Amino acid sequence: MATLSVKPSQRFQLPDWHTNSYLLSTNAQLQRDASHQIRQEARVLRNETNNQTIWDEHDNRTRLVERIDTVNRWKEMLDKCLTDLDAEIDALTQMKDSAGQNLQAKNLPLDVAIECLTLRESRRDIDVVKDPVEDELHKEVEVIEATKKALQQKVSQAFEHLCLLQEVRQQLNSDHRGKMETLEIDRGCLSLNLRSPNISLKVDPTRVPDGSTTLQQWDDFSQFNKDRGEAEMKAATELREAIALTIAETNNELEAQRVATEFAFRKRLREMEKVYSELKWQEKNTLEEIAELQEDIRHLEEDLRTKFLSLKLSHTRLEARTYRPNVELCRDQAQYGLTDEVHQLEATIAALKQKLAQAQDALDALYKHLARLQADIACKANSMLLDTKCMDTRRKLTVPAEKFVPEVDTFTRTTNSTLSPLKSCQLELA
């Protein structure tokens, strides 16, 4: 007889089964509603954050642009200030050198005045008299000493102010370099975007680095540097004007005294011998030719230095262009032009060197002939009278130093710190 096999397990009631189905359906609806709410909120959040991010990026880009403009304006002002400062330094240096040259030039009239007094001590008997010539010579010495003191004071002031200008220039240069670096950094930041390959997360990027300043401190610092530079340049301009005035006044005083002294000497002047006059004329022309040739040699040397700088520039450009990447390393018109420029400069430099050597050979020949002329002049100068020697010595006050060499240095003079190149050459030739 067959039997019913029933699996032993828990049996739920039908209401439980309905309740379970209802709960599953209800929970599914609730989960979908919650998910829908989250999705809507997420979309709103995405829109808001995207808009905020875009606005923030645009706002900060605008701020970077404005900051770059501000820094660039300051950089341009510093550029102008540095240019003006360099020009003022050059101008003041030239004025200081001019004052120094004028100061050095006062040694010559002082030597001449003392030499004339020494020469006139050789007078004998009744001629040893305190005459107007001697009075004017003593007065000339006093005027020269006063002018040297005034010029030395101006040279010292110019040197001190040049030190201040160099200090200001260093500060302006430091500020200018800082702004150049800042512009490079900010322009690099401005060029970045979401697709830039070198963007990454950084450790604590919002930190405030040590040494940070406020915007007002930054502006005050730049303004202070600019104001200080302008103030020092203004003071330098005033100093240059004062130096120029001092030079003019001292030269006028010395010239007036020279005229007065030579007026007293004029009645004592005698004519030179014909041969001496001829030799002196030849000496003068030779000195003028030497001066002109020296000037041409200086111009040749300057041109040669300039051509070397141009050659360095061309070499540097050619070398730099060898580092162009890949197919960019092409022999374009710029490459051919730079190569031609190098060849042209090398030929020019060779021609200038050849002409410079010829000019120096000609100068040596002129110096040798000048030495022979002066030896003959020195022999004939021994026969001149004392007052004639005095007037001949005083000719050095009206003839440029590089064009005049005394025939005979017979008497003790005040000591010059350095000899001119012309005198040194003559000593070597002798």
Swiss-Prot record:
Alphabetical keyword list: Cell projection, Cilium, Coiled coil, Cytoplasm, Cytoskeleton, Flagellum, Microtubule, Phosphoprotein, Ubl conjugation
Coiled coil as UniProt keyword: yes
Pfam name, any one: Tektin
Record flagged with keyword Coiled coil: yes
Domain of life: Eukaryota
One GO CC term, this protein: sperm flagellum
Major localization class: cytoplasm
Residue ranges of coiled coil: 82-160, 273-379
Subcellular location: Cytoplasm, Cytoskeleton, Cilium axoneme; Cytoplasm, Cytoskeleton, Flagellum axoneme; Cytoplasm, Cytoskeleton, Microtubule organizing center
Listed GO biological process terms: cilium assembly; flagellated sperm motility
PTM statement from Swiss-Prot or TrEMBL: Tyrosine phosphorylated.
Family assignment from sequence similarity: Belongs to the tektin family.
Known role: Microtubule inner protein (MIP) part of the dynein-decorated doublet microtubules (DMTs) in cilia and flagellar axoneme. Plays a key role in the assembly or attachment of the inner dynein arm to microtubules in sperm flagella and tracheal cilia. Forms filamentous polymers in the walls of ciliary and flagellar microtubules.
Oligomeric form and interacting partners: Microtubule inner protein component of sperm flagellar doublet microtubules. May interact with CCDC172.
Name used for this protein in its record: Tektin-2
Taxonomic placement: Eukaryota, Metazoa, Chordata, Craniata, Vertebrata
